[in-house]
Amino acid sequence: NGLDQAGIAFVGTSETQEVDLQSLGDAAVGLETGYFYSAAHESAANDAFKAKLKELYPNAEPNPATVSAFDGTHALYQMIGATGGKKDPDAAIAAIKGASWESPRGPISIDAGTRDIVQNVYIRKVEKDADGRLFNREYKTYETQPDYGVQK
């Protein structure tokens, strides 16, 4: 598209998620984005998540939606466990306020005041591996980022 030759840097968020990355082709090489999840995130939790996803759904690609569903389900299990399966909204909310765990996306927590997620944001750059496949290489982490759209 010529933007890079004109000195215009592309800044984005999830535009280079792995589910779309190969279809972008070589024009994507060098693009830098910041987001809370990339399938290329290196961690034991992400490796286990990707392996289980592949086992259950061989054609599925790990992406922000699948990891968000995974974490939402984890939160629900915590809430159900705290209530013993009984209808107790106060106990359910109390169980998750301030909770933290190791997600496939990295460490996350639920802000006790806003009940919104606090998570890392990874700055990554699209590169090509030895087989010519595009991937996001994380090179900087902004840890424990709140939802800046929420007012306390």
List each language-model region with its residue ranges.
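Extracytosolic ligand-binding ectodomains
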Residues: 1-152
